[in-house]
């Protein structure tokens, strides 16, 4: 059984998801696209207990929670508001901040909106997702200010985080991207990111920084470009430079800056939205499906940074 269809307009979204019961049915179909199977006995038929978000097996009576074991685990927020939050995150061009989400959903507390967005960001990375491939640009920069290739600058970051970008080359444009925070610009850090983000055998373009030299021994067709400076630096790796420019504009414009602790999860969102920029309504469906594949996130975990790829 394929995944359920997704709404193709705001009008359809409002018509489809006007009640918590409708949202629950869609969540069931998204979480079990091949049909429900009882975790205890394997039976494929169940009663819906909509008021408690449960499915009760018709054979053994086991009650399976639709939201247990997902990012929606033990939520007290109505499913309709979760669906609206996922819709706004996936389809709103500039994204949405916690302050904006609080206003849009008429939430009493800012913290509720913040937690919802953080949980959705953690659901944006598919477990065991594919690595990008083909011809790829790779570059690194300090978030908050591109150092334009100054080697001295690469060693000094202050409060800035070092982010590495890998961008597929598609004609004159960009394909998929991957972003990650690294501790430093050593070969171990940079090559480690590439190995997690780019498939071996790919053609990898970088600047002339020595940290990228080991890529060739790792099975990549590494083609370093002559290091530039000043106004010529963006021309070396234009797609990666454009990705960094868009990332920093988004972080400052929508979120007014992001601290290092939570930056990896904002990178998750940027990558998710960028890679689905041509199909935003389908991205909503994808996000709901991914939300059902992730383990619960505790409030304490929301304050712990985790690596992205």
PLM features per residue range, with description:
Residues 1-309:
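Residue-level recognition of single "structural anchor" positions
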């Amino acid at each position: 059984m394929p995944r359920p269809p997704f709404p193709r307009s705001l009008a359809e979204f409002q018509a489809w998801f006007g009640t918590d019961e409708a949202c629950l049915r869609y969540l069931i179909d998204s979480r079990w696209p091949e049909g429900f199977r009882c975790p205890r006995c394997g039976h494929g038929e169940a009663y819906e207990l909509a008021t408690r978000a449960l499915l009760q097996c018709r054979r053994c009576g086991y009650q399976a929670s639709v939201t247990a074991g997902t990012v929606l685990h033990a939520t007290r927020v109505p499913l309709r508001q979760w669906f609206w939050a996922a819709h706004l995150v996936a389809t709103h061009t500039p994204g949405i901040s916690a302050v904006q989400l609080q206003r849009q959903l008429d939430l009493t507390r800012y913290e509720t909106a913040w937690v919802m967005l953080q949980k959705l960001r953690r659901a944006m990375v598919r477990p065991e997702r594919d690595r990008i491939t083909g011809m790829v640009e790779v570059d690194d920069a300090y978030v908050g200010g591109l150092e334009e290739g100054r080697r001295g600058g690469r060693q000094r970051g202050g409060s800035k985080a070092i982010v590495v970008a890998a961008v597929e080359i598609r004609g004159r444009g960009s394909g998929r991207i991957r972003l990650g925070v690294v501790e430093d610009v050593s070969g171990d850090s940079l090559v480690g990111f590439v190995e997690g983000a780019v498939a071996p055998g790919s053609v990898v373009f970088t600047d002339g920084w020595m940290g990228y030299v080991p890529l060739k021994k790792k099975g990549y067709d590494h083609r370093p470009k002559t290091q530039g400076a000043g106004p010529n630096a963006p021309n070396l790796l234009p797609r990666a430079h454009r990705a960094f420019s868009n990332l920093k504009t988004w972080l400052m414009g929508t979120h007014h800056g992001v601290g290092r602790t939570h930056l990896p999860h904002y990178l998750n969102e940027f990558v998710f939205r960028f890679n689905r920029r041509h199909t935003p309504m389908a991205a909503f469906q994808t996000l709901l499906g991914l939300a059902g594949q992730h383990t619960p996130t505790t409030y304490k975990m929301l304050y712990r940074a985790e690596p992205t790829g």
